[in-house]
Amino acid sequence: MTLKTIEGTFIAPKGRYALVVGRFNSFVVESLVSGAVDALVRHGVAESEITIIRAPGAFEIPLVTQKVAQQGGFDAIIALGAVIRGGTPHFEYVAGECTKGLAQVSLQFGIPVAFGVLTVDSIEQAIERSGTKAGNKGAEAALSALEMVSLLAQLEAK
């Protein structure tokens, strides 16, 4: 018996990609943006097919993402931001609502929403995940978006 496997590839199909980016903690977020754009371009996406949309912070990213999905015109949305834990419960509220909101948008509109919003305990962890020891989570989110666009195209073709 041969099992059939369907999985996405990182070869960019024709498509447009939106990066919805929270400006708060920009010293980290800009590295995520650079990583995401670099990963998309290295995998065949033209810069003219990438649009960066800036929101004030991570809490606002889901609403902006919803509007982008609602308007159409993009094959995937890549959410990028950074929420760094402080001394109050604010971190839990922002991180949780951002995560839930992005998942809802993806399911509601049937569009891949790649999650590149860092939720970390310290500035050091944020820096590590934006291009040093732990790689670049922006680039990883971009690869996730490419793979999901490919996978959904295959599923829709069946």
Swiss-Prot record:
Any one Gene Ontology BP term: riboflavin biosynthetic process
GO molecular function list: 6,7-dimethyl-8-ribityllumazine synthase activity
Active-site residues per Swiss-Prot or TrEMBL entry: H90
Keywords: Phosphoprotein, Riboflavin biosynthesis, Secreted, Transferase
Subcellular location, principal: secreted
GO cellular component, one term: cytosol
Highest taxon of source: Bacteria
Similarity field: Belongs to the DMRL synthase family.
Subunit structure: Forms an icosahedral capsid composed of 60 subunits, arranged as a dodecamer of pentamers.
PANTHER family for this protein: 6,7-DIMETHYL-8-RIBITYLLUMAZINE SYNTHASE (PTHR21058:SF0), 6,7-DIMETHYL-8-RIBITYLLUMAZINE SYNTHASE DMRL SYNTHASE LUMAZINE SYNTHASE (PTHR21058)
Record-given protein name: 6,7-dimethyl-8-ribityllumazine synthase
Organism field: Pseudomonas aeruginosa (strain UCBPP-PA14)
UniProt lineage: Bacteria, Pseudomonadati, Pseudomonadota, Gammaproteobacteria, Pseudomonadales
